[in-house]
């Protein structure tokens, strides 16, 4: 089976990898990495409908759930973990499941990915519903853990998407919204943490970021729903308010403090002159979109 996967083929350009010097190895890797964005560009028409369905689902209270094993699982967990601080969503709105559980994130758990039943069981643990979106991630496109999860998600009636790095992947036949980014042979044969992993990371960035923009988490190109939980983020929050409203630092800081640290509310109060309570109510009424709230108040 593996010999039919392009991700497992030997790369003809690196047959003498062990004889290359440092700069030659780095050059070979860099040249191969350049192929990844080109392949993703071809997959954009497949990525878009999954994003749009995810926006619809999350507006109705659904969750985005990534499922994967090994590198694929770790990338899903990583993308999910970045959403709360970046976009201000609750940790249970974007979830990453990895075969073998949390410990498998830092230490490989042998055999976990080979059990379809574990994929189903992990989704049952988080009480998957018809409102959710499940995205199965597998470079090979044939990981049993992911297949089991997608099959169960289909049974429940959840939206299903998949991300594979081989054409004609098994998970593509199961998911309603399949994405295939054919990254080809790796510099180091079969090491899919390289180009395949890079492609997966870029696509997951696209999915989560575009979904969050569709949920009102951006104003212009500013990250307005971040949570200022440390000094760096507090400074970033202040700078975002300054950029959005063209005010001085002291004014931004004052409005941020009065808004209880809620960047969106601070921006609306500055742009419209309304009270904090009025800004929050109008923002809520407009689904969290600053632009719509400001338009209503003005």
From Swiss-Prot:
Give the matching PROSITE patterns.
SIS
**Pathway of action:** Amino-sugar metabolism; N-acetylmuramate degradation
Protein EC: 4.2.1.126
Q: Which CDD domains match?
A: SIS_Etherase (cd05007)
| Enzyme superclass (EC) | lyase
What keywords appear on the UniProt entry? Answer: Carbohydrate metabolism, Lyase
Family matches, as InterPro entries: Etherase_MurQ, MURQ/GCKR, SIS_dom, SIS_dom_sf
Q: What else is known?
A: A lyase-type mechanism (elimination/hydration) is suggested for the cleavage of the lactyl ether bond of MurNAc 6-phosphate, with the formation of an alpha,beta-unsaturated aldehyde intermediate with (E)-stereochemistry, followed by the syn addition of water to give product.
**What is the protein name given in its UniProt record?**
N-acetylmuramic acid 6-phosphate etherase
Q: Which organism is it from?
A: Halalkalibacterium halodurans (strain ATCC BAA-125 / DSM 18197 / FERM 7344 / JCM 9153 / C-125)
